[in-house]
Amino acid sequence: GSSFCDSKCGVRCSKAGYQERCLKYCGICCEKCHCVPSGTYGNKDECPCYRDLKNSKGNPKCP
């Protein structure tokens, strides 16, 4: 990943229960959207692309 995504996702996932999984999905979403919401959760309206990405089951993909 890029240093932008790594640093943003490091913050985003700092309190996640499953750190590696959080970082993986955050990284995928960041690469696609070039945006990661601030804070450790919520604030997804800052990044509509990130907010609206869904996985194959139709659930939100991005942490």
From Swiss-Prot:
UniProt keyword annotations, A-Z: Allergen
Keyword tRNA-binding: no
Transmembrane segments: none
Pfam hit, one: GASA
Claim: Repeat is one of the keywords in the record: no
Alphabetical list of InterPro entries matching this protein: GASA (IPR003854)
Tissue: Expressed in peel and pulp of fruit (at protein level).
Similarity comment: family membership: Belongs to the GASA family.
Name of this protein: Peamaclein
Origin organism lineage: Eukaryota, Viridiplantae, Streptophyta, Embryophyta, Tracheophyta
